[in-house]
């Protein structure tokens, strides 16, 4: 049986590995900008100006990277 592809994990991992600057839009409209330093099933660790913020994924609406991210869909 073929393993299902987890696009979210691939996307976040590429952002982390390539140190791609990202803007996070929260559900309340607030914007956070920085680098993804890590993530798990429930949270994203964002670093902004040397400070870390742990954001719960359920509070995030959208990730907007500064440049396009390459992921494998097959």
UniProtKB/Swiss-Prot annotation:
Annotated GO MF terms: RNA binding
SUPFAM superfamilies: Sm-like ribonucleoproteins
CDD domains assigned to the protein according to its UniProt record, in alphabetical order: Hfq
A GO cellular component annotation in the UniProt record: cytosol
UniProt entry keywords in alphabetical sequence: RNA-binding, Stress response
Annotated InterPro entries: Hfq (IPR005001), LSM_dom_sf (IPR010920), Sm (IPR047575)
Top-level taxon of the source organism: Bacteria
GO biological process, one term: regulation of DNA-templated transcription
Domain Sm intervals: 9-69
Function in brief: RNA chaperone that binds small regulatory RNA (sRNAs) and mRNAs to facilitate mRNA translational regulation in response to envelope stress, environmental stress and changes in metabolite concentrations. Also binds with high specificity to tRNAs.
Family matches, as HAMAP family: Hfq
The family this protein is said to belong to: Belongs to the Hfq family.
Subunit-level organization: Homohexamer.
Protein name (record): RNA-binding protein Hfq
Organism of provenance: Bacillus cereus (strain ATCC 14579 / DSM 31 / CCUG 7414 / JCM 2152 / NBRC 15305 / NCIMB 9373 / NCTC 2599 / NRRL B-3711)
